[in-house]
Amino acid sequence: MLTNNLTFVTHGTRKLGVRSTYRRILISQEHRFIFHRIPKAANSTIIKTLLAMDPMIDYGSAGYSDSKAKNKFYLHPWDLSIRDSVSARRNFYYFCFTRNPFDRTLSSYLDKFKEGDKRLLKYRKKTGSDEVPSFDEFVRYLEKGGLHEDIHWIPQTMIIPAPKKISFIGKVEKIENDLRAVTEKIFPGASYKGPVNHNPHSTGASGKREIYYSSDLIRRVARLFRKDLRLLGYGWHN
């Protein structure tokens, strides 16, 4: 692994390390694209759609039962020389998909702070509590330094390069149309039939806001993710 390849380094890389962040970047030299995956932002659906539409992949035999299928067909930054990485960064179609921070934060809590998850175990070790924290307690944990401890809830603008350096930023909330725009660009001529749904970690967070968010929590989460809200064009209602 090329740990000295700094081509794709972001603020998040410096916080979480190369391995944790670079493994989220998928590169296709054949189709000249870079997909920068943001956790808790429809990754499984997007990847499954790419695998299904890629004309160079026999999807029928590959399937998606193998959770490592994406690694068989697409590269990571450490698979490329520094020269090739720089060339790809400059010339390939670079895209990502973002999610409303209010939904992404709640989804991270619902998915990762459950019995048996290593993140809950880490939280318990830090706090000395044996209980599953409430959403309010989770947000308090983020406020006290936990915000930058895990890629599943670190601000999205810390994971990806500056928006002006990305070819296309799609939104999970508009995935039908935005994924069409991406596939038309990277797989010209291929038939787009909509997102291929695959949601092993779906929490339904967007439909549970009213259950978990108080006016105080809205204010606090907005403060934590103010840069995401501003640069990615999100708010409580959009």
Regions found by a protein language model. Name each.
Residues M1-N238:
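Membrane-interface amphipathic segments in extracytoplasmic regions
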